Structures are given as C-alpha cells and as structure tokens.
C-alpha cells in the first residue's frame, strides 16, 4: 500500500489506494479545501486521481503557478458550459491557457456581440454560484467519439482524429456540459470566481485563413479577486498608454485603410524615428560596422536560391516586369550576401560587419495588424556579421555587450537572455551544433548576467540568442536576436580564402537590436506613456511669452537653443500663460520656458518641467547646459 512522501520530506502511509484529495484531507481540512490538483512524481494529476504505489506528492493550490494555470484552463471549460446553455447550436473547438488568461474558439452562425459576451459572463457567474463539482471520467476512445457525435460537436471529432494513439481520453463534466481534455481541472467551480471575459476576436480553424472562421472569446482568471483587480488596473493603465491613442494625441503618426500596415509618420513621430536612426548609426559605426544599402525589389531567382521563395512566398509582395518575377524584400540577408560575394575575401577581411537600416515589407494578414507594433512595411536595424567559426564567440560576446548598452540607453534594465538550441529537425552534424551552441553559451556567460536555455527552439540551421525586455507595466517584449547561420552562405555560395589558401564558408550571424523601428517606437511610447526622455522628445523645450512685449526675446531663445542642436519652438499665441503651460504639459514637452518682462531684462528663462517642478529662473546658457545633461543621460535611470 502506498507511502506518500511530501515536499518537506515527511511521509504518510495508507492501507489502500488514495486520492490526492484524501492525502490533503489527512493533512488538514484547510489544505483539503484549497486543493486543486496534485503533482505525483513530478506529473500533474487531478485531485480525484488515485495513487496506488509509493510516490512523491506536492499538493497544488491556487497559490502555485500550476494552480493558476489549472484555474484558467477550467475557466475556458466554463465558457463552453455557458455558451452551450445560451447558444445550443454553437460548436466548441479548443480552449487553451495563454499568458495571463485563456480563450475558447467557437463556431457559431453569427458573430458574437459585446452584449453576447456580457450574457456569457453573467451565465458563468451564475454557474459558479451553483458551486457544483467538476467530474472527471477516463473514457474509452469509441465512447468519446459516440458522445461527441451525438452532440454534433464536429470539431471535437476532428481533434480526436488528430490523436490516433489515444485509447482513452479524459472527459470533464460541468453538469450537462462535457469537454475533452488531458487536465487537470479544478474539482469545483468555487475556485473560478476571480475571472473576467476581456474581448472577442476572429480566428481560423487550425490557424489557416483558408479554413472556416471561428470566434475567439478571451478571458483572464486569477487565484483571488485581489489579483484580478490588480490585473484589471494594469490593463486599464496599458489602455491609457496605448501607442495608437498617444500617437494621435501627440501627432506622431497615423494609419489609414488605403495603406494597411504602412505608417504615415508626422513631423513629431519622424523626429523620434530620426533620433533612433542617428543613435543606432553612431553606435554601430563605433563598433566596427559598415553601413550598406540594398535594393527594395529583387528577382525571384535570388529568393529561390536563398530558400525564401519556397518557404515564405505567401508573405512576400510580388510584381512582374518584362517577363520577370520580382519580390519586395521581406528581409535583408540574401542581399547582404551579394555584397559579401563581390570581390575575393580573405580571412584577413573577417569579421565583416554589414549594417543596413533596411526597409522591408511582409504581407501580414490584415487581422494580425496592430497599430505600429505589427505592420507590413517596417525598417530594421539589421546587420550581418561574416566571420570564421573561431570568431563567433568574440563577435557574440561583443554583440551582447553592445545590445545591453543600447537597451539601458533607452531606459530598459530588466532584460532576459535566452539561448535557443537545436530542434529535432535540423541540418548539420551534432559536432557543429555542439560548437555553435558552446560559442554562444560562452559569450552569454561572459556577460556575467543570468540567462536560460530554450531547448529545441533554435532554427533548423543554427542556435540563436534572444533578448526580451520588460517594460514599466511588467510586459515582456522580445526584441534583439543573434542567429547563427552556416546555411545561407552555403546556399548563396559565399566563401573566403582561409589561412591555408583553401576556400571556406563563412559563418553568418544575423543580428538586430531594436528589431523594427516601428515596433520599438510603439514600445517606447507605451513604456513612457508618451513622456519621452529629453533626448527622444520631438520638442525638447517650448518657449512661451506672457505678453507680446516678450515675443522677440522668445524667438531669440529658440534661435540660441536651435543653434546648440536642441529641438525648441515658441508659443507666442495671445493666450493666458496658464493655458499654454497646461497645453504643452499635455503634449508632454520636457521643459516649459516662460518669459516675462523680468526674464527679458535679465536675459533669462523661467524653467518648469512637464511634471510641474519649478526649476526657477536661469540664464539661457545655463538652461542649455541643463538640457545638454538631460540629453546625454538618454533614458538611463542612473548617472552612467
């Protein structure tokens, strides 16, 4: 009979097979009430599942990360229960857990409305209040098929077809509603009170736009209502920071139907863009990169040789001229290899670092477009390092150091680094993969910072390093990458003369720091809520007069600041000074300079910050020094 070993090392003996719930009850009534599931010998199981032999057991409660995932998964099933009660002809598809929530894909003859979502949420709350038990039954495959046939659940039957080796399946019964899942799930609906449905969107069966359209109901669920309230507050703050809203408020950019996924940059937004580009140009030049420019439109022959035509053609914009097919480039790498291939290269020429602010276009589905975060036309801070295998470690280490420096300059200090390693389907020998992964791992170790492996997540031809930034709302943004690639040089016949006078293939390191300028600017807008650090702000200082008598001196101050390289403008309107200050504070200008008679007389400016801090009156030259210091700090939080 089983001996159960608990996480603290204590043991409990039972004279019969025992369920997880029974073990919890033997420890205490409070734990039994909080038990969601168990982890038996490291494997998650339902609270009702029995343990028949000696095992280790961890009781899972809402406080555990696994517990939160179970709550969310069970909430997805609860969506199904409510939908089938309200809309019996709806057909249920899948309901997985996602970051901070869940969704359920549903086929229904008409689009769900916000009123439908409110009704579904209300029915879910009514079902929770019934406090019913969720019943698990392991059921033979044939019976599962018969059950879903009788209920007309066509998509469930298709999913069963995808699992030919499953002889028995877990069915979870929410009263009359039944769903199929590996589990585990909550034992009772009382655990599901802290939830909220968030939105409805479209989706496609199996994610393929050629298939029938489904409707996706999203929701979030938490261990308790306090956590849910904190999440809702965070989402509300994110909505206030939405780059689309702030972009309009600050007159940065717009998008319109005639050019879906293409950005119309206004002067203010283009100013931010130009600062980014000039900064990255200098950073890359200082680190040994040479800048190049390659064509926008390239014959399909090159894309066929690179492999992109067979794997990526549907995402490429194409055109034809004089009986030749062309594609607008979706990436820069094949073109950079063409530059490398011009002229004979020696090992003495390596490493060669080619950088390009490459304008790329990808035919993203219209439903996937999102402001300037997900677009069809974008510019990358793209570069490719051509080097020998022996140079990979140093190049990777230098790139990591540079990338972290750039992120700190933009105000991001919480950075996760991950190494994606060999997938099951890959090219190249294990020895080559060992060396490539080892070089990147050694480079990461040299940074002195924590990093983690992502096993099996590398490209089929090589490992890669990913950089993920955390913003002020705790959201993660995957930005920089360093991809090891021996494949493209082979396909495009790149070579150099090695020290032994033989031809060898270079290793190609694809790398980007910001990723796309458009997406990175969107991130900056939301991270700073539009209140850019002085070095990025479209207007760094606005000079305001109190009466017409100060207009000439205000214009003189703007001229002096402009000649010093600052972005300043005047506001000489016949409006009250309080009105002007409020307006430019809302426009998030870092410094507000007020000029009255006293300032004209002393050749000074009265300085306020957009946060409302009064810095007092100072000579124009002193303010210029203050602004120069603010600009030199960039977005750093320290005095580096």
UniProtKB/Swiss-Prot annotation:
Ranges for domain TGS: 1-61
GO cellular component: cytosol
Keywords: Aminoacyl-tRNA synthetase, ATP-binding, Cytoplasm, Ligase, Metal-binding, Nucleotide-binding, Protein biosynthesis, RNA-binding, tRNA-binding, Zinc
Binding annotation for Zn(2+): 333, 384, 510
Main location: cytoplasm
Gene Ontology MF terms in the entry: ATP binding; metal ion binding; threonine-tRNA ligase activity; tRNA binding
Location in or out of the cell: Cytoplasm
Source taxon at top rank: Bacteria
Manner of cofactor binding, per the entry note: Binds 1 zinc ion per subunit.
Record protein name field: Threonine--tRNA ligase
Name of the encoding gene: thrS
């Amino acid at each position: 009979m089983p001996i159960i070993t608990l996480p603290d090392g204590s043991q409990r003996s039972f004279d019969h097979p025992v369920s997880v719930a029974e073990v919890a009850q033997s420890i205490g009534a409070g734990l039994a009430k909080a038990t969601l599931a168990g982890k038996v010998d490291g494997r998650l199981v339902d609270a009702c599942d029995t343990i028949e032999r000696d095992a280790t057991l961890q009781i899972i409660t809402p406080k555990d990360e696994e517990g939160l995932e179970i709550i969310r998964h069970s909430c997805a099933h609860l969506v199904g229960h409510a939908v089938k009660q309200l809309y019996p002809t709806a057909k249920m598809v899948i309901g997985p857990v996602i970051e901070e929530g869940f969704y359920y894909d549903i086929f229904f003859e008409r689009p769900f409305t916000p009123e439908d979502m409110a009704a579904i949420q209300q029915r879910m709350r009514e079902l929770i209040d019934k406090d019913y038990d969720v019943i698990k039954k392991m059921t033979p495959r044939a019976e599962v098929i018969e059950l879903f046939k009788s209920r007309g659940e066509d998509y469930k039957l298709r999913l069963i077809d995808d699992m030919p080796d499953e002889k028995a399946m877990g069915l979870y019964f929410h009263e009359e509603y039944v769903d199929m899942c590996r589990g585990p799930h909550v034992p009772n609906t009382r655990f599901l009170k802290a939830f909220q449905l968030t939105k409805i969107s479209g989706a496609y069966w199996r994610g393929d736009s050629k298939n029938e359209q489904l409707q996706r109901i999203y929701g979030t669920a938490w261990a308790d209502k306090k956590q849910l309230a904190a999440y809702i507050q965070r989402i509300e703050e994110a909505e206030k920071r939405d780059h689309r809203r702030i972009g309009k408020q600050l007159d940065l950019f717009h998008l319109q139907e005639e050019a879906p996924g293409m950005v119309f940059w206004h002067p203010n937004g283009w100013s931010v863009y130009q600062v980014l580009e000039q900064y990255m140009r200098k950073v890359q030049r200082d680190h040994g990169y040479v800048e190049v420019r390659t064509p926008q439109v390239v014959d399909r022959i090159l894309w066929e040789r690179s492999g992109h035509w067979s794997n990526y053609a549907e995402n490429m914009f194409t055109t034809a001229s004089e009986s030749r097919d062309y594609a607008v480039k979706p990436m820069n790498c094949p073109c950079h290899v063409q530059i490398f291939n011009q002229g004979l290269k020696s090992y003495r020429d390596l490493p060669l670092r080619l950088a390009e602010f490459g304008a790329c276009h990808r035919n993203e589905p219209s439903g996937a477009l999102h402001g300037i975060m997900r677009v069809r036309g974008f510019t990358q801070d793209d570069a490719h390092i051509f080097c020998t295998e022996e140079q990979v470690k140093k190049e990777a280490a230098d790139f990591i150091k540079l990338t972290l420096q750039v992120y700190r300059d933009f105000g991001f200090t919480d950075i996760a680094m991950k190494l994606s390693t060999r997938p099951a389907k890959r090219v190249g020998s294990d020895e080559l993969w060992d060396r490539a992964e080892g070089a990147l791992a050694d480079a990461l170790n040299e940074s002195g910072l924590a990093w983690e492996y992502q096993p099996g997540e590398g490209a089929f031809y090589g490992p890669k390093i990913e950089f993920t930034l955390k913003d002020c709302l705790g959201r993660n943004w995957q930005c920089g990458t360093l991809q090891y690639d021996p494949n493209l040089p082979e396909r495009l016949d790149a070579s150099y003369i090695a020290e032994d006078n033989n031809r060898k293939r270079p290793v190609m390191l694809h790398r980007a720091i910001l990723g796309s300028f458009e997406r990175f600017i969107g991130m900056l807008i939301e991270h700073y809520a539009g209140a850019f650090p002085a070095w990025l702000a479209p207007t760094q200082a606005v000079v305001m007069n109190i009466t017409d008598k100060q207009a000439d001196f205000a214009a003189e101050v703007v001229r002096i600041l402009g000649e010093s390289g600052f972005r300043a403008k005047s506001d000489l309107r016949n409006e009250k000074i309080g009105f002007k200050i409020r307006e430019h504070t809302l426009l998030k200008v870092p410094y507000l300079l007020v000029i009255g008679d006293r300032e004209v007389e002393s050749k000074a400016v009265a300085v306020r910050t957009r946060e409302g801090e009064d810095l007092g009156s100072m000579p124009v030259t002193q303010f210029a020094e203050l602004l120069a210091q603010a600009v030199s700090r960039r977005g750093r939080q320290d005095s580096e």
